[in-house]
Amino acid sequence: MTDAHCHLRTGAKRHLICEPFSGERGEGDIVFYGVHPWAFLPESEPLSVTWLQDLRERLINDPSAGVGEIGLDRLKEKEISLSMREGFFAQLSLAFELGRNVVLHGAKCWGQVVAAIKKLQEEFKEKALSLPKPSFLFHGFSRSGGLIPEIAKLNGFISVGPAVLNDHAANYRRLVAEIPSEILLLETDATSEENIASLEEIAEEVASLRSTSPSAIIALNESNLTRFLSH
């Protein structure tokens, strides 16, 4: 089984590993380079003045790599800073320019993340660039289902994580049941060896909520990941 989003190897057969990450890359793993939105918060260490150029060089030197985890965040601060917006837009533009897939973060502001993608899609369409169109993995998506059709139109996928195991997360569990089968993925979002959720347990819970079998959900995860990575 593949872990669609994590920050270190979790024991799955294959991983989509995002920065910031620790440990080594395993055979078959896909790495995503990018600056997390929390790095743009006032209390974070200042970024190098060459951070964007450094990111570009790393991506060019690793043709199989994607861009992520990037995005916007209103979990830590109610207002999104200009530096966070500019940092997200710069990295998203780079993904479009190089034709790389993207892992997205959008805590409490998914609508704004979707709006940014749509804006750039129009800009790059006008430039008539014959580049591969990025796919987008909406990691930890937890907004109402009303945004899901727009995500699907953007060539987006939604990954379901450990929150589905929380019996008290009623709204999230209802959302998981509504995600179209063709864009559903599974993730642990593991950041350390102490907090690795069981991908099998997540698959079992998702299967229960969707009235199907864990094996069917696992097969769906693998086929959808193939589609996500093939764009």
Identify the function of each model-found stretch.
Residues M1-H231:
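Mid-domain alpha/beta scaffold segments of enzyme catalytic cores
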